[in-house]
Amino acid sequence: FLSLIPHAINAVSAIAKHF
């Protein structure tokens, strides 16, 4: 499960770049 956390953070970071 912990390995999914960096992926989630990376996804949020990528989405934030659009805004």
Curated annotation (Swiss-Prot):
GO biological process: defense response to bacterium
Function: Has antiparasitic activity against trypomastigote form of T.cruzi (IC(50)=0.34 uM) and against promastigote form of L.infantum (IC(50)=10.06 uM). Probably acts by permeabilizing cell membranes. In vitro, shows slight cytotoxicity against macrophages (IC(50)=34.42 uM). Has antibacterial activity.
Organism, as annotated: Pithecopus nordestinus (Northeastern Brazilian leaf frog)
Keyword Ion transport: no
Keyword terms, alphabetized: Amidation, Amphibian defense peptide, Antibiotic, Antimicrobial, Secreted
Phenylalanine amide modifications at: F19
Main localisation: secreted
Residues in the signal sequence: none
Protein name in UniProt: Phylloseptin-N4
Tissue and organ distribution: Expressed by the skin glands.
Family under the similarity heading: Belongs to the frog skin active peptide (FSAP) family. Phylloseptin subfamily.
GO cellular component terms listed in the entry, alphabetical order: extracellular region
Intracellular or extracellular location(s): Secreted
